[in-house]
Swiss-Prot record:
InterPro entries attached to this UniProt entry: CANIN_dom, FAM178
Compositional bias ranges of the Acidic residues kind: 999-1014, 1033-1048
GO annotation terms (biological process): DNA repair
Alphabetized UniProt keyword annotations: DNA damage, DNA repair, Nucleus
Protein name per the record: SMC5-SMC6 complex localization factor protein 2
TM region(s), chain numbering: none
Species lineage: Eukaryota, Metazoa, Chordata, Craniata, Vertebrata
Biased composition (Basic and acidic residues): 112-130, 149-166
Length: 1129
């Protein structure tokens, strides 16, 4: 069998040739067909009717029947729909064929139906051949339709004139492979290049009319021209003779099907002079388009079938196929209904393409080409494949992404899907608008790696994967709980370690875990800085567990008091319950009730007890305000109105002691001294109260929970006592005031009140000291009592600090400080205040005893070997610091009396001499530095006080004088004797005139002035016994002086010829010292003689003689001094 295959050559303009899109035939072809076909006239009407019905069913853009001139005019324009009432078809991406039997969508022509009924026999034969073809091609009876083939059928006359071609003549007619048009975009589905289209069509005697109303194809198709796999078979085109049986078929495929060999003659049969155009099908969807299924149903009589199109994706395929065929006038057009039915039964299997894809990717010499095989001969013609540069620029992923999201699956069985309802236009548009889901990891293959992927059945929403899942949250929760448990265990272990720190240290020292060398290093570099405490240790006065043992806010009932109310407000208060009374008091009813009427002492005592025991500080303060109001109102009535009915209730020592005992204090701790005891005992106080066990237990349990004493109760008691002592100065006697003073100072040492401000204590003590009548006598008792309140030196400092800053308070501080100093140094109080005035001289005997070394010796002797040396040293400096603090309090003067100026100067020198100089600082003993710093501050304070003090009486200025023990005894007579040397015994040292002239005049004047001052001093000269005796002995003195001058002339003459420089050079230092010793011995002898002579000489003569000798031997003495200086130099 001869056949003709026409293959398009590569064009110089990248193949962008305007293809012909019409299915019409030229005039010469028409004549040949009319001559050769005898059934042309009979089948013409039937063909026209079928084509018209096909156009209505498919609703493709542009009609199938258009004139040839219209096709040429609209060749490069986009196709538009012939049905104006459905513009949505312009955006449709699928070919859809509506069922003919749907009356709601289409209108059928009865004439056309009649024509089709006449041609029933012809359609039946076509159906049979299609069934035979399905059984021969594949077991499933269907082949795959490639959606990536881009080809177009065109007529030959106009095409051949514009484009060169290669003809292989087998018969009188030929098949032409033409390029698809380039102006159709995304009109069809785009599939891989290895897809196969297999069509079997029977030759019909009915000749369809030539139509030019064919839709134009995409403009991107020329870019994909001749894209076929090198290993795939090209389209096989065969033609039968003119008088052959009425069957036509065209087979175009790119891959080899082992189940349907390419040599089967029945796959492609074309009548003579017939031409057929195979439309290009393109899968060119964007990612936002969803796969759609087009189903086209036909007649129920079996004349038509459904076309099934399937697409497959390939990540490495850019090659396209284009196969164009021509059919005879007796053959149906490919766009007709019969052709669609035949094409629907052909579908290619997916696994047939995988071997070829892998082979193509592995072939390094694979060149894109189109292979055309002529059936009946073993020749294969390969033509080079053209690839558009734009596709190269876009890359592989562009086509792959589009193909991944585009799937069309149509059924191949017409009988099983004829009655199914097709999707509506709205559903199709919704598919296009729907946003695609992010593809999964395996949706795309690796670049340039052709891997067979199964066609996804449908687009499904990917399951959202959250980062924090329930299991992770549970794991995090468990981990958090474990960390919390670990933290709790660590905290507990830290607390246990802190509690057992001392035990561990002792065990380590016993076990000798640390070596001796390491222990020495630790001792060497250890630092002790907390030896001197800033807060006093205190003493336990109150026991929190005993708080409220006598009464509490629940047992105190105002209704038990038998008093007569004076007004309605008092009656309401006295008859109300305890909890209601407190509310009424807070509302101010108590002050209103007793503002104009006197308050009964029982009510005031009840209020005093309630404010000392109520746990609520707000209620306690309001009760205290009511007490203040009642007391001030009573005092006002007493002073202004002289009313005898009003009285200020002042709590007695007994009431005060009861309150303190109820707060948890013991009787012995309040009154520890035997010399100072109240007139009542603890048993007397307990007889007045019979506490209820329940209330007592509840109150004690509340205090145990708090574990601290309520400070507001103590402040309320002290505040009311201060008010009472201020309003009634004579309410207490001196003995009671001393008891109150001792109790308040004792309470001030409570450990729970260490950080409590001293304002409340100081205010009460100020009123107590002020109310003492016999102050001069009671001050010594007060000093003795307060000194014995504690044995700790820091607690005694605390007692001194809480005393007020009033005049009596300062005086008591000074005397008490000295008393405590004497007690600490002498172990007994040896100081007894003699009067109200304090003298600084009382501190002089104690300062030398405050030396740290002396304190260390006393402590070591008292305690023996109980403590180590380091501990004793710390205690010694701690005691020294306390003693210095008391000394500072004793010398705390704002203006020092001038009479005590010398005493303060003496104390300053003693402080610096005995204490400051005795402290040896060390980097390991910072407490020593603290003591030394405190000494320096005290010394500076005293010096400032000295500058602010007036000088002594009768003096304008007060100069510094050394202390008496530092003054050296000086005898003016000895100084004059040293100066008055005997010139006869030291002739060598007599000065020459040259040496005398070298001295400056200023030195002479200064010496003369000193001598004159010494002579003018009356203490140095003895009184003249008799002026007459002095005149008689004057002559004898002159004679003696003249003799002395004659003796002094001899050494002067000898010294004139003496070379001093040479003599000094020859004389050594040892000889000079020996000469000096000889001179001193001679001077001593001369002095002894002079003293014997002075006994018989009058004073005036002696003075005159001394003056003459000094004037005469002045030069000699100066020369002697100069020689000694030169010798030493």
């Amino acid at each position: 069998m001869n056949s003709t295959v026409v293959v398009k050559r590569l064009q110089p303009n990248n193949g962008n040739i305007n293809p012909r899109n019409n299915c019409s035939l030229s005039s010469m072809d028409k004549k040949n067909l009319l001559q050769k076909s005898s059934s042309y006239n009979r089948n013409r009407d039937i063909s026209y009717a079928l084509c018209k019905e096909l156009n209505e069913n498919l609703r493709v853009r542009g009609g199938l029947f258009q004139s040839e001139s219209a096709v040429k005019a609209r060749r490069h324009t986009l196709p538009h729909s012939s049905h104006r009432r459905s513009p949505e078809r312009r955006n449709s991406l699928l070919f859809q064929q509506r069922p003919r039997n749907s009356s709601g969508q289409f209108t059928h022509n009865p004439n056309q139906k009649k024509d089709r009924m006449d041609n029933r026999d012809h359609k039946t034969s076509i159906k049979k051949e299609l069934n035979n073809l399905n059984t021969m091609t594949s077991p499933e009876g269907r082949l795959s339709l490639s959606a990536k083939r881009k080809s177009e059928a065109s007529t030959g006359s106009e095409r051949e004139t514009k484009r060169p071609r290669v003809d292989i003549q087998a018969t009188s007619s030929s098949s032409i492979l033409n390029s698809p048009p380039k102006f159709i975009r995304r009109a069809f589905l785009k599939s891989c290049n290895e897809s196969v289209i297999t069509i079997k069509e029977t030759n019909s005697p009915i000749k369809p009319s030539i139509s030019d109303n064919k839709p134009k194809l995409s403009s991107s198709l020329p870019r994909q021209l001749f894209c076929a796999d090198s290993n795939a078979h090209s389209s096989q085109t065969t033609k039968s003779p003119t008088n052959a049986e009425p069957k036509d078929a065209m087979v175009a495929r790119a891959n080899k099907n082992p189940k349907a060999p390419p040599s089967q003659p029945h796959l492609r049969k074309v009548s003579p002079k017939s031409s057929m155009t195979f439309d290009s099908i393109e899968t060119h969807f964007t990612p936002d388009n969803c796969a759609s299924v087009a189903k086209m149903s036909k007649k129920t009589n079996g004349e038509t079938e459904i076309i099934a199109l399937s697409t497959n994706t390939s990540s490495s395929s850019h090659y396209k196929e284009s196969v164009t065929g021509r059919s005879s006038p007796h053959q149906h057009d490919l766009s007709s209904t019969s052709f669609t039915e035949q094409a629907s039964s052909c579908k290619m299997e997916l696994d047939e393409r995988a071997p070829m894809k892998a082979e193509q990717s592995r072939s390094p010499e694979a060149i894109p080409a189109v292979t055309v095989k002529v059936e009946g001969s073993g020749e294969h013609k390969c033509f080079p494949q053209w690839k558009d540069p734009l596709d190269i620029e876009l890359g592989d992923d562009w086509d792959d992404e589009l193909r991944e999201h585009c799937v069309i699956s149509l059924s191949s069985s017409s009988s099983s899907h004829e009655d199914e309802q097709l999707p509506s236009l709205k559903e199709i548009l919704d598919w296009t608008v729907r946003v695609p889901v992010t593809p999964e990891k395996d949706a795309y293959s690796e670049p340039n790696t052709p891997v067979l992927k199964a066609v996804p059945e449908a687009v499904k929403t990917k399951a959202t994967s959250y980062r924090n899942t329930l299991e992770q949250m549970l794991q995090e929760k468990e981990q958090y709980q474990r960390s919390k448990e670990l933290e709790r265990q660590l905290l507990e272990s830290c607390e246990e370690d802190l509690m057992n720190l001392d035990e561990d240290e002792n065990s380590e020292s016993k076990g000798e875990d640390i070596s001796l060398e390491h222990r020495e290093i630790l001792q060497r570099f250890s630092v002790t800085s907390c030896a001197i405490r800033d807060i006093h240790p205190g003493e336990e006065i109150f026991t929190p567990a005993k708080f409220g043992q006598l009464f509490n806010h629940q047992t105190l009932d105002l209704r038990k008091i038998s008093v007569t109310p004076h007004n309605r407000s008092q009656q309401i208060l006295l008859q109300a319950r305890s909890e209601h009374v407190l509310s009424l008091i807070s509302a101010g009813l108590l002050r209103k009730a007793y503002f104009s009427f006197p308050c009964q002492p029982e009510v005031t005592r009840w209020l005093f007890q309630m404010t000392s025991v109520h746990p609520n500080p707000i209620i306690s303060s309001r009760i205290m305000q009511s007490l203040h109001t009642i007391a001030l109102s009573a005092a006002q009535h007493i002073v202004e109105h002289k009313s005898q009915s009003f009285t200020v209730w002042v709590p007695s020592i007994r009431d005060i002691t009861q309150v303190f005992l109820n707060m948890g204090a013991s009787f012995i701790s309040l009154f520890p001294l035997d010399v100072l005891q109240p007139p009542f005992t603890e048993g007397d106080l307990l007889e007045d109260f019979k506490p209820e066990e329940n209330s007592q237990d509840s109150a004690i349990s509340e205090i145990k929970d708090d574990a601290t004493l309520p400070v507001h109760n103590l402040e309320s008691v002290l505040s009311y006592l201060s008010l009472c002592t201020a309003l009634c100065p004579k309410a207490y006697t001196d003995e009671e005031l001393l008891l109150l003073l001792a109790v308040v100072c004792r309470i001030g040492l409570e450990t729970h009140f260490q950080l409590l401000p001293t304002g409340s204590f100081s205010l009460l003590l100020q009123n107590v000291l002020k109310n003492i009548t016999d102050w001069d006598v009671q001050i010594s008792k007060a000093c003795q009592i307060l000194t014995d309140l504690s044995e700790d030196h820091h607690n005694l400092r605390r007692i001194v600090s809480i005393l007020p800053e009033s005049s009596r308070g300062k005086l008591l501080k000074r005397h008490l400080s000295v008393s405590i100093i004497s007690k600490l140094l002498n172990h007994t109080c040896t100081y007894n205040p003699s009067g109200t005035d304090f003298k600084l001289s009382e501190l002089k005997p104690f300062l030398p005893q405050m030396r740290p070394s002396s304190l260390l010796k006393s402590l070591s002797s008292a305690r023996g070997s109980e403590d180590c040396d380091a501990t004793l040293d710390q205690q010694a400096y701690y005691l020294c610091y306390s003693l210095l603090t008391l000394t500072n309090e004793a010398s705390n003067f704002e203006f020092l009396p001038s009479a005590q100026r010398n005493d303060l100067r003496c104390l300053s020198s003693l402080l610096e001499k005995h204490i400051k100089c005795d402290i040896r600082e060390s980097e390991k003993m910072l407490y020593r530095s603290k003591v030394k710093d405190f000494v320096a501050r005290i010394y500076t304070k005293w010096q400032v006080l000295l500058t602010r003090t007036r000088p002594q009486e009768g003096m304008l200025y007060d100069y510094w004088k050394p202390p008496p023990e530092d003054e050296l005894p000086s005898s003016p007579q000895g100084q004059t004797c040293i100066k008055a040397q005997d010139p006869q015994e030291s002739p060598e040292e007599a000065p020459t005139p040259e040496w005398s002239s070298s001295e400056s005049e200023e030195d002479d004047q200064s010496k003369d002035e000193e001598e004159e001052d010494w002579l003018k001093d009356p203490d140095n000269l003895q009184p003249l016994e008799n002026q007459v005796k002095m005149e008689q002995s004057a002559e004898d003195c002159v004679e003696d002086v003249s003799d002395a001058e004659e003796e002094s002339d001899v050494p002067k003459q000898q010294l004139e010829g003496f070379d001093i420089s040479g003599a000094l050079e020859d004389i050594s230092e040892e000889e000079l010292f020996e000469d000096d010793e000889d001179l001193l011995n001679e001077e001593e002898k001369q002095l002894l003689k002079d003293e014997e002579d002075r006994k018989h000489r009058p004073v005036e003569e002696a003075s005159q003689q001394i003056e003459d000798l000094l004037a005469k031997h002045k030069d000699t003495l100066e020369m002697k001094d100069g020689m000694l200086l030169d010798a030493f130099i």
